[in-house]
Amino acid sequence: SMHGAEAPPGFEQMRLVLLQHGGLASLTGKTGLAMLRHRQGPIVAVVDPDHAGQSLQQITGIDRDVPVVADLPAAMAFAPEVAVIGLAPSGGRLPDHVRRDVLAALRSGLHLASGLHTQLAEDPELASARCADRWIWDLRREPAGVGVAQARAAQLECHRLLAVGTDMAVGKMSACLALLEAAELRSRPARFVGTGQAGILISGEGVALDAVRVDYAAGAVEAAVLRAAAGLPRDGLVLVEGQGSLCHPASTATLPLLRGTQPTALLLVHRAGQSTIERMPQIPLPDLRDLVPT
């Protein structure tokens, strides 16, 4: 089995089926929705019994033509090679109805990629269902050899842009990937550092920040930024996906991202019209003019 934020060889071009149970029309499915928006390699089917047979474009507004099916056996008609868990369930555990299709995928000879906190390769039932030359990639793992941060990114010559958000799930990653595409169109050298499960699944590398022990979190970000910056010229751009939120009371990720990136610029991402933290109406969002000192 594989673990850590480096994708298995060939992953970028492999044929994926996304396990999106109940997550095509909700934030629970944001990992899979992000892959549908931004993955360049093939996605051949989406499993969501709630929307089986419907048009992906009509359900999600995403301009990609992928069949939506009821279960894993139905997805096998489209010859997938890898099953990817496209859900970010609360608490990071594998729900039972998804587990059924994960087992079916492994027994059908597919590889499995998961960004859940639960390490699926260590699950005895799943491990024994896996075929001999297939992998289970648990990407939400602390990288090997993490150390403490030393502000080393401050010595880099290239630009370092860190996305920060007024709330969670406001589009920090999507904004970075849009900038990456824009930079490529202008032949501006740019690299993306994924820091969450979707960013890692899309780019094939990065650091799963919320799997890193807090003392090493800034150091893990620093190491990823230094890797991304290697060989970039002065006008090069390192785009670091933000995590958590500047204003959310549960968010711890902001500080290690600032420390590890030593950013030359911050990209503030906000959901237009939002005035309080999602599901916490008692916490108002500050005026954007107060958040950005002029």
Predicted stretch roles:
Residues 59-76, 89, 93-98:
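Glycine-rich, highly charged phosphate/nucleotide-binding loops
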Residues 44, 49-67, 199-211:
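N-terminal beta-loop-helix "entrance" segment that forms/cooperates
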Residues 118-125, 137-139, 143, 151, ...:
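Conserved catalytic-core segment of NTP-binding enzymes
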Residues 42-50, 113-116, 267-270:
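Short internal beta-strands
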Residues 146-192:
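Walker A (P-loop) phosphate-binding motif
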Residues 3-54:
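N-terminal Rossmann-like dinucleotide-binding module
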Residues 91, 101-160:
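Extreme N-terminal, non-catalytic leader segments
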Residues 180-218:
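N-terminal phosphate/diphosphate-binding loop that engages ATP/GTP or pyrophosphate donors
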